[in-house]
Amino acid sequence: MSNSLNSSKYQPLTTRQGDRIAVVSGIRTPFAKQSTAFSTTPAVDLGKLTVKALMDKTDIDPKLIDQVVFGQVVQMPEAPNIAREIVLGTGMNIGTDAYSVTRACATSFQTTANVVESIMAGTIDIGIAGGADSSSVLPIGVSKKLASTLLALSKTKTVYQKLSLLRTLSLKDIAPVPPAVAEYSTGISMGQTAEQMAKSHGITREEQDALAHRSHTLAAKAWKDGLIQDEVMTAFPEPYTVWLDHDNNIRHDSELASYAKLRPAFDRKYGSVTAANSTPLTDGGAALLLMSEKRAKELGYEPLGYIRSFAFSAIDVHHDMLMGPSYATPMALDKAGISLSDLTLIDMHEAFAAQTLSNVKMFASNKFARECLGRDKAIGEIDMDKFNVLGGSIAYGHPFAATGARMIIQTLRELKRRGGGLGLNTACAAGGLGAAMVLEVE
């Protein structure tokens, strides 16, 4: 155990019998840009596709799965409990427990943590965690005026009464209402927050574009070198006329100069955040199979790796709302009993290049550590040779609830290729939330 952190905060994630919690396997759909390959596939179907592929890949007896915890950020009213629909749609035992959670962009870190805690408590032996989201199949709402009028119409008895109510509606009242993109509590969007963070922390347009170019270049190389294919299923969504076996957002011919051509997306005059240095709206799903180390051995599985620790944070939503990794990571490192320098790999969710680079700066800031974290010194400067080595969300895309599981799968597989070690996954999330998880591979 490292002496550089407070060892009194070390919290081993084990069962009562001392078994670690193993990630036996993981899989995901290809991630598709909004309105492309999965344009008519709702999140619940993406979730079913993913979990069924995971069950087929591991050849697990469906009766052995005790629990499914799944997430969806953009909720569909007709299927509010995506986890239960997945159980019912994939051939699992009808008695399999299932519930859904949401933690914005950190959702599948939360579903993983929930399954880990259930295994530690002894309430389940085997669980599936993950998430799916569609930015193409969205719940399009109606105005409050139209909603109240439709309700009143259902209670009228005469044609005159109905017409009288309908006359009160304007064209604005009957226009569709798309899902909100701004924070409910502040009215500030994620993109606006990224702009604020770029200005507050001195992140230049050139630095943001360089990170985006790096992300695409590394992701393209990872696919070209055959490092990603085995964790991505071939998806045949209904009506089964097309299929997809790769992420379709990655720029395989990325050129740094091309990024400078785009106009800022959120602050047209003075901004630096563009569509190219931000993660795109994306469709996809990802899932993990978890169980105790002992149970994995009994069933003949060789685990991908183990969950060493996790931590979640919550901060103010008015300023630096996407700084969650800088708050959650020190807690996760403490709970794992390690320091930043002990890590073999660091994978940070790239919601925006500005947000990512702001967090990278704060990891190394003693001032931030003292004033915001109450710590004597910073956790340390990130070794960029360890950072997002296969590219990040700017390249792969970001189906909100699936990103955490993608990162876990990708990091564990890369650690195994490197002969083992410790990896950090961390993400910001809407609402000022953050997540960090330490992974271990022998």
UniProtKB/Swiss-Prot annotation:
GO molecular function: acetyl-CoA C-acyltransferase activity
Record carries keyword Ligase: no
Tagged with keyword Lipoprotein: no
EC number(s) on file: 2.3.1.16
InterPro entries in the record: Ac-CoA_C-AcTrfase_FadI (IPR012806), Thiolase (IPR002155), Thiolase-like (IPR016039), Thiolase_C (IPR020617), Thiolase_CS (IPR020613), Thiolase_N (IPR020616)
GO BP, sorted A to Z: fatty acid beta-oxidation
Top-rank taxon, per record: Bacteria
Keyword tags: Acyltransferase, Cytoplasm, Fatty acid metabolism, Lipid degradation, Lipid metabolism, Transferase
Any one of the GO CC terms: cytosol
Reaction equations catalysed: an acyl-CoA + acetyl-CoA = a 3-oxoacyl-CoA + CoA
Function, in words: Catalyzes the final step of fatty acid oxidation in which acetyl-CoA is released and the CoA ester of a fatty acid two carbons shorter is formed.
Full protein name: 3-ketoacyl-CoA thiolase
Organism the protein comes from: Aliivibrio fischeri (strain MJ11) (Vibrio fischeri)
